[in-house]
Amino acid sequence: MIDARDITLALGGDWHGHQGNAPCPVCQPERRPDQRALSLRSEGGKLLAFCHKGGCDFREIVKAAGLPPDRLALDPAAQRDADAKRADYERAQLDKARALWGRARPITGTKGEAYLRGRGITCPLPLSLRWASDVHHGPSGRWLSAMVAEVSTGAVHRTFFEKTGARIPGNAKMMLGPCAGGAVALSMGPGPLVVCEGIETGLSLASGLLGEPATVWAALSAPGMKALRLPERPGRLIVAMDGDDAGDSAGRALAGAAYARGWQVTLLPAPRGLDWNDVLQGRTAA
């Protein structure tokens, strides 16, 4: 049996006494040392785990971490308790997300628009993007500006900036509220549905890289791409992947699931080591 300490250490986390903290492999797949959303502990022989960032399901955490489920002893009562806590947490986070979205203003004419235009993006900016001042950045404890993107689940994605308009160097992108299965709609068009990871990537595709009108969605992360809920009616789908292993794996997983549901699927991988905003700006791989 794998206990809480084993899982914590396997995820690259820290164990202190009777509790561990580690990166959540679902919503923090980078597993950086500053990422510690997942709390784990053993209590009365029961395994308890909770993701404080996204409220991720522990069974999905186990799967994403590559841990053998047949060696896990999950107590049903503990799992029900974790599920109830996750539901309460998600409701509270969703309320915070809607409040932030409600006070944010349209992105046109803001430092957020200046940032996007500075990255070569020329397409009209969607109503799903707004700009907010004085947004709390948890990892640093500072109050910063943020580009706020509305997710189809009601959650928001935040990209944090200094008051000068420069994007902060670390932990710049964070989600607020339940995002699983959702996406940010960046453009609407009569052509195919195009799914990518990042917001800047999607806007870059809509800035002339596709060669045809399209509906563009940003799934916000590689795990988000894998979990994306597609429209019920199948059609044409272009999966625009980042040029790395995580992007390739996520894109192929989405493509396979879509194909099985009757979608006509095309893969559009970025060059190795690049994303589509790099391509738009004429960058080349090192």
Roles of regions detected by a PLM:
Residues V195, G235-A246, P269:
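Acidic beta-strand-to-loop metal/phosphate-binding motif
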Residues T122-P139:
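Short, basic/aromatic recognition patches
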Residues L230-G235, N277-A286:
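Short, surface-exposed amphipathic charged segments that create phosphate/polyanion-binding patches used
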Residues P223-G224, M241-G251, R272:
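Acidic, metal-coordinating catalytic cores used for nucleic-acid/nucleotide bond scission
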Residues C24, C51, L116, A149, ...:
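Terminal peptide-recognition signature
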Residues L74, A218-S221, Q264-L274:
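A generic structural motif
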Residues H137-E232:
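Phosphate-handling DNA/RNA-contact segment within nucleic-acid enzymes
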Residues M1-R119, P124, D245-S249, Y259, ...:
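Non-catalytic accessory segments of DNA primases and related replication-initiation nucleases
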